[in-house]
Amino acid sequence: VKPLYSGRLDWVASLKDRPCPLNLNPVTANLDTSSLPAAVLWDMDGTLVDTEPYWMRAEHELVESFGGVWTHDDAMLLVGSGLLGSAAILQNRGVDLAADAIVDRLTTRVQEQLASAGIPWRPGALELLRELHAARVPMALVTMSEQRMAQQISGIVGFDAFSTIVSGDMVQQSKPHPESYLTAADVLGVDASQCVAIEDSLPGVAAAVASGAVVLAVPHMVPLEPSEHYVRLDTLAGVNLTTLTELYASRRRSSPSLTTTQTAKDATPA
């Protein structure tokens, strides 16, 4: 009886003289993988997804329910801030609830909007996320939102993008303190200085810079001035694995002293 595999022996033998590619991943086949960042750390609200309008609506409804007034300028003050700090501001505007209750109400309302209106992805974010995942670059979601909301958004991505999620209810210090970014890098088993962090707000950028990461700042609701401390991009649209790797390598060459030894004081925005 002729073995089923006998017809393949000549084909197998023909491979012995062919060079064997070390990189079997088609996404990174033409890329110097030694120049890839150790991980990419994503902010969520305003960077990955355009949820800031949902938060603003939730804040407005909550303040008005207690007879107060909440303006657009008021809402802009909270962009990128931790939820407990935001709750204190809402209390000062007349919301007669404990801080934890305010956070719970806001998060629930935003999640309701996500469920009814869908996930508004920021331009280019999902495409870059998908390409990084295909290239097997470790990724973390680093957000000041609660874990339940981060899990909701992560679950809708459509693939297992994030190795870990560090949320605001997991850390002691909110952005602009670097704790969340340092925690994410630690969980991934990498040094923050070998990571790329993608952010959109001043507190978030300050936190990422203070962690020692190479920072891509993509402003959304609040403008960010050019700075030697980060790479500013108008949008993630058109940014791919090659672009990100080149930006990372260029930044590492121009700032070889990037380190995770910066202090929390350095993270505080001017």
Describe the residue ranges of each PLM region.
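Asp-based, Mg2+/Mn2+-dependent phosphohydrolase catalytic module
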Residues: 1-38, 130-131, 137, 146-270
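Conserved G/P- and acidic residue-centered "switch" motifs that form tight phosphate/ATP-binding loops
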Residues: 43, 47, 143, 200
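Structural motif
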Residues: 78, 142-144, 198
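Hydrophobic residues in well-ordered beta-strands that form the structural core
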Residues: 50, 141-143, 217
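A generic alpha-helix signature
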Residues: 53-54, 101, 143, 175, ...
